[in-house]
Amino acid sequence: MTDTAENQTQNNWQAGHPRSIRSFVLRQSHMTAAQQRAIDTLWDSFGIDYQATPADLDARFGSSRPKILEIGFGMGTATAEIARRLPETDFLAIDVHGPGVGNLLKLIDENHLENIRVMRHDAVEVVENMLQDGSLDGIHIFFPDPWHKKRHHKRRLIQAPFIAKLLPKLKTGGYIHLATDWEEYAQQMLEVLSSFDSLQNTAADYAPTPDYRPETKFEARGKRLGHGVWDLVFKRIG
């Protein structure tokens, strides 16, 4: 998949969904030569193209290991590190931004990781159309855009309608792990997840950061500036 072809796919999606409220903005970002080369040479091995019908994740990974969905991986550094720490778990990583996709593919190659597959598409459509019910053991959404202006809150990804779409895809006993450095968004996340009877908080409110989640450079810089970070881990109980 070339970056040009994927841009056309995204343009077609926008044309077909003019009234959709999306949680992301498609930025014009510079793709380095190394990132583009990674897409050109590694996509066939580690990329998954969007389809509007359910996909067999075990077949796509070539394994029956537990499956984790990661939505919004940025430049992919944390995703690659989590996959390295959890080699017996498969990760389906979704983002819309080309440089991040290229960088994650590059990291997969450099670290000899076999347990990541990458998609460049709107995660909401993937959840709605590609993921089979009960196919996921966990869901990671780390540092989604907080859309801090009140008039933009409707763009936030973590809202009840989206969680309602995710829940059927999650096995009983599976978990949802969210993280944010925006306190007001953390409160909203807590309220949204707590509103579902089929989800149980694993902590009294916010959870300690699990060992598998590395600290990102952005997160470390925020902590130096006195910013907090909030993790939430909820388990599906029914």
From Swiss-Prot:
The active site is at D145. S-adenosyl-L-methionine binds at E70, D95, D122, D145. One of its GO terms (molecular function) is tRNA (guanine(46)-N7)-methyltransferase activity. Pfam families: Methyltransf_4. One of its GO terms (cellular component) is tRNA methyltransferase complex. Its EC number is 2.1.1.33. Belongs to the class I-like SAM-binding methyltransferase superfamily. TrmB family. Catalyzes the formation of N(7)-methylguanine at position 46 (m7G46) in tRNA. This is tRNA (guanine-N(7)-)-methyltransferase. It comes from Neisseria meningitidis serogroup B (strain ATCC BAA-335 / MC58).
